[in-house]
Regions:
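Active-site beta-loop-alpha junctions enriched in small/polar residues
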Residues: 1, 23-26, 51, 58-60, ...
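Histidine-acidic metal/acid-base catalytic patches
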Residues: 12-15, 66-84, 91-166
Length: 166
C-alpha cells in the first residue's frame, strides 16, 4: 500500500497516465500465472487514480512459446485485459517475430509502441532508428492510425538524431 501511495503521488505530481512493467526473466506457466495475479492487483489499484499499467516485452518473452503463443502474449492473456501492452518493436524483431504483424495481431491491447532498431546479426546492436532491420515505417503507421502513444529509444547518439527521426 505504501508503494501505491508513492506511485499515486508521482502520477499526480507529474501527470503520468501509464506505468510500465516487464515480464519475469523465467517465463514458465506457474511464474506467469503468479505474475498475472500480481499485475492485475496492481492494475486495479493504479486504475483508482487514473493510471494504466502496461507490460513491456523483451526478446526472450517473444522467443519463449507457451500454449502456442509468445510468453508475452500469454501473460497478457492471463491478465484478462487489466494490463495493456507496450510493444518494443526492436525486441519483437530480435525475438523472431515480424513487428508490424505482431502489432496487428495484438492491436486490441497495444497502448504504447516503443521504437528501437537493431543492426543485422545475432547480437542486439543498437543503431540509429530507421537504419536497422526493423520496418519502423509500418510500426509508425500502425500507431499513428490508432492514435497510440509512441516513444523512441535512441541509444546510438553519434549522429543526427532529429534528422534520423524524420
Amino acid at each position: 500500500v505504501q508503494s501505491m501511495d508513492k506511485l499515486k503521488a508521482i502520477a499526480e505530481k507529474s501527470g503520468l497516465k501509464q506505468f510500465v512493467v516487464k515480464t519475469p526473466e523465467n517465463s514458465t506457466e506457474s511464474i506467469l500465472q503468479q505474475t498475472a495475479l500480481n499485475y492485475m492487483k496492481a492494475a486495479d489499484m493504479l486504475e483508482t487514480f487514473g493510471v494504466r499499467l502496461l507490460l513491456h516485452n523483451e526478446a526472450g518473452d517473444i522467443q519463449t512459446k507457451i500454449a502456442g503463443k509468445t510468453a508475452y502474449e500469454h501473460l497478457l492473456d492471463l491478465c484478462m485485459g487489466k494490463v495493456g501492452a507496450q510493444v518494443d518493436v526492436g525486441w519483437v524483431q530480435f525475438g523472431g517475430e515480424d513487428p508490424a504483424a505482431f502489432l496487428e495481431r495484438n492491436a486490441a491491447r497495444v497502448q504504447s509502441v516503443h521504437h528501437k532498431d537493431f543492426g543485422a546479426g545475432r547480437e542486439p546492436i543498437d543503431v540509429p532508428v530507421g537504419t536497422g532491420n526493423v520496418d519502423l515505417a509500418a510500426c509508425f503507421r500502425f500507431a499513428q492510425s490508432r492514435d497510440i502513444p509512441q516513444l523512441v529509444d535512441q541509444e546510438h547518439f553519434d549522429s543526427d538524431v532529429p534528422g534520423e527521426l524524420q
